[in-house]
Amino acid sequence: MYKNILLAIDLNDEASCRKPLLSAVELARTFGARLHVLTVVREVEAILEAKAAPFGYDLIAADLENRIAALIRRADASDLKPNILVTHGASIYAEILGVAEEAGADLVVVGSHRPAMKDYLLGTNAARVVRHARCSVLVARE
């Protein structure tokens, strides 16, 4: 049923990554799908962190890739050989949708949290992905 699954995670809140990660891993195993794991750094954060780091954005991206790899190992999912992706952009949901298109994802898995007041006014990234994705979206709540 699914051939390419994109898991989008927020490494600023690693505790919220657990359920979406386990859901994506289970689905990838069940369907023999390719798993892509993505984190998006907001453009403002990327610029500020790159200026603070002596080696810039590449060092930050490498650190994030290592953190994703550690999460994958803890979920006992290394056998899936997931494609780890780190991108940056002004719009997190637009980055997720763009990567989903590029990867040919037929399922996007995202986490969701208890909405804050600003989320009621602006909408969460998960809600925007659900609204605009061209493929199925699974929202895993913690």
Predicted feature locations:
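Structural beta-alpha unit
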Residues: R74-V108, P115
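Conserved acidic residues
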Residues: K3, D106, R134
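A short acidic, glycine-rich active-site loop
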Residues: P54-N66
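Short secondary-structure boundary segments
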Residues: T39, G111-H113, R141-E142
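Short, hinge-like loop/turn segments at secondary-structure boundaries
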Residues: A53-G56, E101-A103, A126-R128
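General small-molecule cofactor/ligand-binding pocket signal
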Residues: H36-L38, N83-T87, L138
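Glycine-rich, Arg-bearing micro-motifs that act as flexible, cationic patches
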Residues: L107-R128, H132
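Small/aliphatic-rich secondary-structure junction motif
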Residues: Y2-K51
